[in-house]
Amino acid sequence: AFCRFNGQQCTSDGQCCNGRCINAFQGRICIG
């Protein structure tokens, strides 16, 4: 599965390259 970088939208399983997935105003995004 692909992973997302910080500031990008999380994948369906919430996988981030680093950091974690949070619920942001514009949807679920990865943060460090």
UniProtKB/Swiss-Prot annotation:
- What's one GO-annotated cellular component? extracellular region
- Disulfide-bonded cysteine pairs: these are C3-C17, C10-C21, C16-C30
Q: What is its main location?
A: secreted
Top-rank taxon of the source lineage equals Eukaryota
* Tissues expressing this chain: Expressed by the venom gland.
Which Pfam families does the record match to this protein?
Answer: Toxin_29
> Which InterPro entries does the UniProt entry name for this protein?
Toxin_29
Subcellular location(s) per record: Secreted
Q: Which UniProt keywords apply?
A: Disulfide bond, Knottin, Secreted
UniProt free text on domains: The presence of a 'disulfide through disulfide knot' structurally defines this protein as a knottin.
Family, per entry: Belongs to the neurotoxin 17 (21C2) family.
The name of this protein is U6-ctenitoxin-Pr1a
Q: What is the lineage of its organism?
A: Eukaryota, Metazoa, Ecdysozoa, Arthropoda, Chelicerata
